Structure formats: C-alpha cells, structure tokens
Regions:
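Short acidic/His/Gly/Ser-rich catalytic and metal-binding motifs that mark active-site loops
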Residues: 1-4, 47, 201, 238-240
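Class I S-adenosyl-L-methionine
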Residues: 2-179
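C-terminal target-recognition/interaction regions appended to catalytic cores
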Residues: 140-269
Length: 269
C-alpha cells in the first residue's frame, strides 16, 4: 500500500488500485492451505475497506468474515523501536494461523538510541570518506551545508535566525520544521524514507556535535552504513556493485527492518 501523495485521504485511498493488491493475497489464501500467514503494510492499511457479502468492512472485520472459521487472526501495529531496532518505524502486522497452532506475541525490548547505535562511528562532513565500509558521506549543496552547520542537534534550520534555508536570491525558502532537521542522539532514528539522501527532506540530517566555534559537525544525511545499522541490516552487506547509493536508500525506505520480522516470526511454535 502506498502511504504518500494521492493516498492521503480515505477517498483517494479507496480509489487507488495499488491498495487493492491485498485482494490477490486473499485469493492465494483461499487456494492454498497455509498453516501460518503473515501480512505486513503501513498502519493506514488497517483503515482500508473491502466489500464482503454486500457490506463494506474494514480489513480486520473483512479477514474475520472470510477466514475466522479456519484461522485465529491477530492484527497489531508494531513499532520497530520496541523490538531492538534503533529506528521508529510502525508497521501493521497481520498474523493468521490455524486454530490448533500457536503464534506468540513478540517480546518488547528497550529502545536503542542513535548515540548507542552510531555514536561510535567517525565524524564525516559532506563528501568525506572513512576507512569503514559504506561509511561515506554524500556530497551536498554548499547552501544546505552552511545552514545545517548552524543548526543544533534535534533542531530544524528553519528555526535559525540567520542561517536558514535560502533561495539563490537570498529569499527564505518556505517549508516545514520537519525538514532541514537534525536527528536526536537520545532517541531512535525517525522513520527512514525513500528520500534519506536529501537534507531538505524529513529529519534526515545526522545529529552532529557542537564544535569549539559554535557550529555543529556532520552537516549531512546518514551514510549507508549508518542507515544499515538503524535498519538492522548487516553494515558490511555486499550489495551488487551496479546498485547506486540512491537506489539502496530507496530500497531501505520501502523495506521492513529484518530484525522486526524475525521477532514476529520467532513466536511461531
């Protein structure tokens, strides 16, 4: 299910064909005799409505009407940050399993902060490269770098009095305080999106550290290594060489942290 752009309203969600791919899953469940079934999507997925026996039902009621005679059905929204992943990423998880079987709830864990997860990695500025695999900073516009150097940890450059986001003519850029924003060391990372390459997108900038001159270090987005860590992906992953930095970031932005799925499926008995 898409959670951006034209999917922001209930009406438009109901009229976007992509959001009905779920019905193909239902068709497969009808044909096959699975013991366990896992369906995953964004939390808004649970608000979708489908026709059953002439009635328009929300997803949970729809599945219950279709399959409750054969399966126990559990519907939850699990946030990755409560399951050992240093990223806030809520996901809708539907678990279906035959009535004689067991699927236990995943056990919550304490939150892991960004400081714990990536605070040990070398500081990098735009375009710099470290000796660690995948720990290479993207190159950013000088105007973006300048305003982020004067932006404290956890703050947006839109809050700056002098060094705020500007157009080439010096005019202030219009935008939200969720963009041009640094992350917070003492919290998990925010949800990683497909635009983790852009300083101007949502809360993508490294937390940084205050320097002796009053500016802040690491005026850049997270490196791939940092993104892998906060997404519970092996930071030394050998992905295909033909895949670009941008493409890998898009994959991560569309993905589910593998450790979250592991915590869910290990409850199968």
């Amino acid at each position: 299910m898409s959670n951006i752009g034209k999917n922001k309203t209930d009406f438009l969600r109901q009229n976007d064909s992509r959001n009905f791919l779920f019905l193909s899953v239902v068709d497969v469940i009808k044909i096959k005799d699975f013991d366990y079934i896992l369906i995953e999507n964004v939390p808004q997925f649970l608000k979708m409505k489908y026709f059953y026996d002439g009635k328009l039902l929300e997803l949970t009621d729809y599945l219950s009407a279709m399959f409750s005679d054969k399966y126990d059905i559990k519907v939850n929204v699990f946030n990755a940050k409560y399951f050992g992943i240093p990223q806030s990423r809520p996901r809708a998880i539907v678990r279906m399993y035959k009535k004689h079987l067991t699927w236990n709830e995943p056990k919550e864990q304490r939150e892991i902060t960004l400081k714990e997860a990536i605070g040990h990695l070398p500081s990098l500025e735009s375009g710099e490269i470290s000796n660690l695999k995948h720990h290479k900073a993207r190159v950013h516009k000088e105007s973006h770098i300048e305003c982020m150097r004067y932006t404290p940890t956890g703050k947006s450059a839109f809050e700056n009095i002098v060094y705020f986001p500007k157009k080439e003519n010096g005019e202030r850029v219009k935008g939200f305080k969720s963009s041009y924003k640094r992350m917070k060391w003492e919290q998990p990372a925010p949800t990683i999106t497909i635009r983790s390459d852009a300083i101007s997108s949502q809360e993508n900038v490294h937390p940084g550290r205050k320097q002796a001159d009053g500016t802040y270090s690491d005026a850049r987005v997270l490196t791939l290594r940092e993104l892998f860590i906060v997404s519970s992906i092996n930071p030394d992953w050998d992905y295909p060489e033909e895949y670009s930095d941008t493409f890998i970031r898009q994959i991560i932005g569309e993905s589910v942290p593998p450790k979250l799925m592991y915590q869910v499926v290990k409850g199968i008995k």
